[in-house]
Amino acid sequence: MLTPKGSAADTLPSAAEILATVRLQQTQQKIDLQGQLRQDALVVPFRLTQNGPVIRYSFTNPPETLQLRLGDTDSRLEELSQSDVEKITPAQFDRKVHGTSVTYEDLAFKFLYWPNARVVGEEPVRSRRCWKLELQAPSRESQYSNVVLWVDRQSGALMETEGYDWRGRLAKRFEVISVQKIEGQWFLKQMRIEELQPGTGKVQSRTYLEINK
């Protein structure tokens, strides 16, 4: 739980402190669940397993296993096969996951480690008090120049994320729609991912990431 420093109640924690809390929150799960990516008529089932900082997405049609390792200073997204482990490189970041709006970079959580970040203030998201952060990409390896985060003050959970292209236009939005309690812990139930037309803000595609108990 984030606790503002200092005597003043409205003193903001640093962006580094908030991001450290988000990373910690992301690595505290131990789960084995079923989920799906749903975009219009397309439904892509997957198995989601996590053991601390290692998160695995296992798809069956076609077969693909993606593994995310959340480290202290960086994350690593890998593609697993029966005989090999291949690191996902920045050149593959814009590759879409099974034809949905979700890309490899979106699964990699690289932005949680970007050093150029600042706290803008506090804004509510779905009645939750959230810190609002602006992050700047350290290089053009990312498809996003800037990312804006809304982080739940109490839990450190990501409630909403916006990614902007290299012309400063909103390109993608991730929003937690609902959560659920699994074995005494709150966990994502549904997230909406919207890919937007640059410059107009019109939604080009909408994908839902849904997790079942």
Report the location of each language-model feature.
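One face of beta-strands
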Residues: I31-G35, F46, I55-Y57, S145-V147, ...
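N-terminal cleavable signal peptides for secretion/export
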Residues: L2-G52
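Short, surface-exposed beta-strand/loop "edge" segments at domain boundaries and coil↔beta transitions
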Residues: D40-V44, P62-R69, S81-I88, E141-Y144, ...
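Gly/Pro-enriched, hydrophobic low-complexity segments
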Residues: R129-K213
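Short, exposed beta-strand/loop patches in secreted or surface proteins that constitute
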Residues: P45-Q50, Q67-L70, A117-E122, I177-V179
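A generic structural motif
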Residues: Q36-D40, S58-T60, E78-Q82, Q136-P138, ...
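Flexible, processing/modification-adjacent segments and terminal tails
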Residues: D10-A20, L24-K30, D72-S145, D165-G168
